[in-house]
């Protein structure tokens, strides 16, 4: 058996020592007395091979049987004691798969996504033969998409997605001067018109900045 990398303090009570005159064995420094001790290789091998499992205090060994035991323990260990390398790998693969699903969902969405659940405004655009997106000149419309939750691809509930009916700005803010309008004689009509015009101006500015 070749040299060991061991924690002598953990096993010194279980392993017999040879005489210091012997040339065989691996030299280990005793930190308390600062004298050289010679560990019996046969006794040490018997100690390791007789253990049901190899713990961190046993350190590592070049012995094939001990290596096999370490590998076996790393695979079948539980969460309360040792960490399984296989478990870590499976967890990382699961996280990467979820990240891929999120990116795919975001890339496939053409209306914009609000992960916190918000309103995203977008202009109406048409696709030409040159595969370029150009703004429609005939009508500028506003669509509000309210997104709540996340995609079912992530294993959760489906997003609630309500699409507001598209209306032209001119139709949305046209004056209610018709004969059948109940607001015509309202005492608050003047304040309402000022507020409505201000809202229209803000909305147009928002659209132009997009």
Swiss-Prot record:
| A Gene Ontology molecular function term of the record | RNA binding
**BP terms from Gene Ontology:** viral genome replication
- What is the recorded post-translational modification? O-glycosylated.
The protein, known as = Non-structural protein 5
What interactions and quaternary structure are annotated? Homodimer. Interacts with VP1. Interacts with VP2. Interacts with NSP2 and NSP6.
Does the record bear Heme in its keywords?
A: no
- Where located? Host cytoplasm
InterPro entries, alphabetized: Rotavirus_A/C_NSP5
């Amino acid at each position: 058996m070749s040299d060991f990398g061991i924690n002598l303090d953990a096993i010194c009570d279980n392993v017999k020592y040879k005489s210091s005159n012997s040339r065989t064995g691996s030299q280990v420094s005793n930190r308390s007395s600062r004298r050289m001790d010679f560990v019996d290789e046969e006794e040490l091998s018997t100690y390791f091979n007789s253990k049901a499992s190899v713990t961190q205090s046993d350190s590592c060994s070049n012995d094939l049987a001990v290596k096999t035991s370490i590998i076996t323990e790393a695979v079948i260990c539980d969460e309360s004691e040792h960490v399984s390398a296989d478990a870590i790998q499976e967890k990382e693969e699961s996280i990467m798969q979820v990240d891929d699903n999120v990116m795919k969902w975001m890339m496939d969405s053409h209306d914009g996504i609000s992960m916190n659940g918000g309103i995203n405004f977008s202009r109406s655009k048409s696709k030409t033969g040159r595969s370029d997106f150009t703004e429609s000149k005939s009508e500028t419309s506003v669509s509000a998409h309210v997104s709540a939750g996340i995609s079912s691809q992530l294993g959760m509930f489906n997003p609630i997605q309500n699409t507001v009916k598209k209306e032209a700005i001119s139709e949305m803010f046209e004056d209610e001067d018709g004969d059948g309008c109940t607001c015509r004689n309202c005492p608050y009509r003047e304040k309402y018109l000022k507020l409505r015009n201000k809202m229209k101006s803000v909305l147009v500015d928002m659209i132009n900045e997009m």
